[in-house]
Amino acid sequence: GQLGKGVETVDFDRRTVPSRGREATRIDAAHDGYASRFGLTHQRILTLSGDGTELAGEDILVPSSKNGKRGKIAFALRFHLGRGVEVQLSGDKRGASLLLPDGRLWQFRLGGDRGGAGEITLSAEDSLWVDGDGRPHATEQLVIEGLALRSGGQFSWLFRKTG
């Protein structure tokens, strides 16, 4: 395959880490696909609990050069959901309930913004999933949107199985 346009470097690391007295799997990944246009590198840290009931994530936008736009930079982080997942946004627009077709319930929650980007919002938008035969199927996606400063930003989130 080929990396997306503008991506020159991708870093990836996977390891087992302690988490609440148990082992968890942590993945650190980064790419420079936004460096030439926005002057930012995107890093994502994922930590999956040993029992698979929590996925904690952190998206970090790090200044990579003096290139890129001045002022605040709009961003959108997208989480494409599987077929048949029903989404109900919370009243504060910082969380969502995800009802799976088999009846299991997951919660999604935004954490704090430690990068000074200001208000970040969560919404649900239409999306598509293409099956193995090339047929598209309507799905939904969760979208985190906000403005990052040129100095970067740090945004945490959590998926948790609740039922």
Positions of the model-derived regions?
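CBM-like, beta-strand-rich accessory domains located in the C-terminal region of large
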Residues: 1-163
